[in-house]
Structures are given as structure tokens and as C-alpha cells.
Amino acid sequence: MKNQYLHIKTKELNFKAKLLWDDAPETCEAILKILPLTGKLMQTRWSGFGVWIDLGEVEIDEVPFENHSIYLAKGEIMFYPGFESMKEIVIPYDKVAFASKAGLHPANHFATIEDSSDISELGRRVIEEGLQPVIFDIK
């Protein structure tokens, strides 16, 4: 399982993210159980330069904070377990300080996109075109 990859597919953009089993094992396990996951990516409201998918209707295991941070860089995928608000996955396309209207929140960094050269384009599309369909899966 050490070299497992999360595949993220939008309309025309595809990303491959290495799961961080050594740093966030419970989060990786919980995410695997909900795959394949389809939904819509939207622009973050409070956090900066990122897109996110709401997991509100998805049955996902409770996980502790692990490998958690408030600040993430381009391509560092995080899972917010929903302790203060809804559960979500966030993909930064630049710097993110994960927050809600209640303030800053730590989230679990569980995967990192290997080639993030197109991630800024994903951010641009979400801003200019609106919601983007997405599929998360393991191949």
C-alpha cells in the first residue's frame, strides 16, 4: 500500500497523488473506503487558493487529526474530518490557510499530487466556469 495513488479526473485534467500512508494511515484508509467518489469541485470560500468537494452526504469513517496542518501548499491534498463543520476534501492550487467563518482549522494532509503543473489551470476553471465535475479513484 505504500505506493498507492489517488487518481483525480476532471473534464480534461487528470492528476495523480501519492497517498501518505506513513503520515496519515487512518485518513488514507477512510478515503479508500469511499472510492470511487464523484462530485463537484468548487472554489474555497475562506481558505485562499484551493478547490474543495463537500462530503456531507458521504458515509465516511471518523478519523483523528494526523499529519494535520492549517497551511498547505499547491498540490497537498487535505481531508477535513468535520469537527467544526462539514467534512470535505481540499486541493490547493496555490497557498491555502484552511478556514471557515469560525476561523482557522487544522486538516489532515493525506496525499500529494506528483505533477502539479496543471493544478493552477484547475483553479482558473473553477473560478471562471464554476463547479467542475470530478472523480476520485484508485487505479
Language model regions located:
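N-terminal intrinsically disordered, low-complexity, charge/repeat-rich segments that act as generic
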Residues: 1-23
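Glycine-rich active-site loops that engage anionic ligands at enzyme catalytic sites
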Residues: 19-139
